[in-house]
Swiss-Prot record:
Lineage, top ranks: Bacteria, Pseudomonadati, Pseudomonadota, Gammaproteobacteria, Pseudomonadales
Active-site residues annotated for this sequence: 288
Transmembrane segments: 23-43, 494-514, 517-537
GO biological process: regulation of ubiquinone biosynthetic process; ubiquinone biosynthetic process
Compartments reported by the entry: Cell inner membrane
GO CC field: plasma membrane
Protein family per UniProt: Belongs to the ABC1 family. UbiB subfamily.
Gene: ubiB
Pathway(s) annotated for this protein in UniProt: Cofactor biosynthesis; ubiquinone biosynthesis [regulation]
Biological role stated in the UniProt entry: Is probably a protein kinase regulator of UbiI activity which is involved in aerobic coenzyme Q (ubiquinone) biosynthesis.
Domain Protein kinase residues, every copy: 125-492
Protein name, as recorded: Probable protein kinase UbiB
InterPro entries named among the record's database cross-references: ABC1_dom, Kinase-like_dom_sf, UbiB, UbiB_bact, UbiB_kinase
Length: 539
């Protein structure tokens, strides 16, 4: 392991020198003692030609030379536009996670070890030449004995030691950055590397990816918008995933889409609808929707349907995050910057002590220029990015789910405008958001929320009883006293009145519902009424 670490260090140093990344480092506002280090680096004593490549290109090429783990880290960084200069973020978007396949016999041996069976006993056909190969896994086509066409995804062998060593160096660099630079501390580099560590190890667990795929497939069962391939759970293991093979056109295959006369406007709009459906209906979204993971069905090109693969990275939002996000978007497009600032504070995304007026002014300064463009040219992803950048200046905590959301939105938006340049994202999204907001306060939703709260009443009653017993239990050193003081009387009567009113309202709501619902849920209302009456009339 130590030999691997030393070899890796020399490799990193060689790449740093080759692409002159030290120039990028020393251009930052560093302490004097850190700047003095440049005079003791031997390679800086020699004459150096000025590089013709931009800093973004040099950074991207360096990550490519350092291998797949650094490539994937660069891809993660490309989604953090709130942390990086735009020129570097744009270059990192070009990173391609493509590496040569590993030996096919090694792949077969690994699959057989995971399945506990020979390839010929599980598959009637297995293509030894892989369909695709990436840094974490490669994919082979096959056919099950039962006749289904499938793909078999297998994790590369020996990845964990390499990942562990590369992550160790990334953590060292991140901690150094936090120690020497106040600006770097604001960007939380150690937290960024920790997020990447979780992401990369999650991708090594193909059972997690299988579960994500099954969830997404269930969410869109019977949908005209999106199809997710079936997972064959009998043959899934931590390092092997077997799922239905799909046939479709790559979403970036413009010539193929044109040949089959695909309705490009509908295709672009359906992509936006899929995004908002995942966010606001399901609160579960595919967070790696780059063009390599998206296909278009060749069936019914006049009503095109997407096909999504590779659900290794997913995100989810809490109901509170959903609500604040929707309200933020509405407030932003109404140019109600005070409301946007207040929502950020109310949600806990920025500290409660943030000065509202200053935060509002900062948001206005950044966002007003955006509205000089026609509405159809305004980028949702850029809106979120600008809001996050501004909020970071006010110590906004990193919200991993919002980072994934921004990344997904940028992918969907960029893809939609590539398919149909006239796509008006706000006009497409606004009806969906308005419908979602209405449904949030509909009687059906409110009744459902009430039912879920009613189900908690037995637990609440038990907790209340335990609390009252603890309150009434005297300490050993205290003289015996009644379970409540006379000064508690008004509070207890107020609690009783609240229980009485709550029970009456709940009983009325239940009486408006179906009869079978009434019989199941009437007793909690009765308990509330009895407890309320007792607290009011008792002496």
């Amino acid at each position: 392991m130590k030999l691997l670490a030393v070899r890796r260090l020399f490799r990193i140093q060689r790449v740093v020198i080759r692409y002159r990344l030290d120039d990028l480092l020393f251009a930052l506002p560093l302490p004097w003692w850190m700047l003095a280090v440049r005079f003791v680096l031997p390679w800086r004593w020699l004459p150096r030609r000025k590089s013709e490549l931009s800093r973004g290109v040099r950074f991207r090429l360096a990550l490519q030379d350092l291998g797949p783990i650094f490539i994937k880290f660069g891809q993660l960084l490309s989604t953090r536009r709130d942390l990086l200069p735009e020129d570097i973020a744009d270059e990192l978007m070009l990173l391609q996670d493509r590496v040569p396949p590993f030996d096919q016999q090694v792949a077969i041996k690994l699959i057989e070890e995971q399945l506990g069976a020979r390839i010929c006993d599980v598959f009637s056909r297995f293509d030894e030449t892989p369909l695709a190969s990436a840094s974490v896994a490669q994919v082979h086509a096959a056919c099950l004995k039962t006749g289904e066409e499938v793909v078999v995804k297998v994790v590369r062998p020996g990845l964990k030691p390499i990942i562990g060593q590369d992550l160790a160096w990334l953590f060292i660099l991140a901690r150094m950055a936090e120690r020497v630079s106040a600006d770097a501390r604001l960007l939380h580099p150690v937290q960024v590397v920790m997020d990447y560590e979780k992401t990369i190890y999650d991708e090594l667990d193909l059972l997690r990816e299988a579960a994500n795929s099954s969830q997404l497939r269930r969410n869109f069962e019977g949908s005209d918008l999106l199809y997710v391939p079936q997972v064959y759970w009998d043959w899934c293991r931590p390092k092997v995933l077997v799922m239905e093979r799909i046939y479709g056109l790559q979403v970036t295959d413009m010539a193929g889409l044109a040949d089959q006369r695909t309705d490009m406007k509908m295709l672009a709009e359906r992509g936006v609808e899929i995004f908002f459906t995942q966010i606001f209906r399901d609160s579960f979204f595919h967070a790696d929707m780059h063009p390599g993971n998206i296909f278009v069905s060749t069936v019914n090109p006049w009503a095109p349907k997407y096909i999504a693969i590779d659900c290794g990275i997913v995100g989810s939002l809490t109901p509170e995050d959903q609500d604040y996000l929707a309200r933020n978007l509405f407030a932003f497009f109404k140019r109600d910057y005070r409301r946007v600032a207040q929502l950020h504070i109310d949600s806990g995304w920025v500290p409660a002590e943030t000065k509202l007026n200053e935060f509002e002014a900062a948001i206005r300064t950044v966002c007003e220029p955006i509205f000089e463009k026609p509405l159809k040219d305004i980028s949702f992803g850029q809106v979120l990015m600008r809001l996050f950048q501004t909020a970071r200046r006010f110590n906004m905590e990193v919200q991993p789910q919002l980072v994934l959301l921004q990344k997904t939105l940028l992918n969907i938006e960029g893809l939609g405008r590539q398919l149909y340049p006239e796509l008006d994202l706000w006009s497409t999204a606004q009806p969906y958001l308005e419908r979602w907001m209405r449904e949030r306060v509909s009687p059906k939703t409110l009744l459902g929320n009430l039912q879920s709260q009613v189900e908690q009443l037995p637990h609440i009653a038990g907790m209340t009883r335990d609390l009252l017993e603890r309150m009434s239990r005297p300490h050993a050193s205290d003289p015996p006293r009644p379970w409540h003081d006379r000064k508690d009387e008004p509070v207890l009567r107020l609690i009783g009145a609240a229980l009485l009113v709550g029970g009456a309202i709940q009983g009325w709501v239940m009486s408006e519902a179906a009869t079978q619902l009434l019989t199941l849920t009437a007793w909690p209302a009765a308990i509330m009424l009895i407890a309320g009456l007792y607290l009011i009339v008792r002496r």
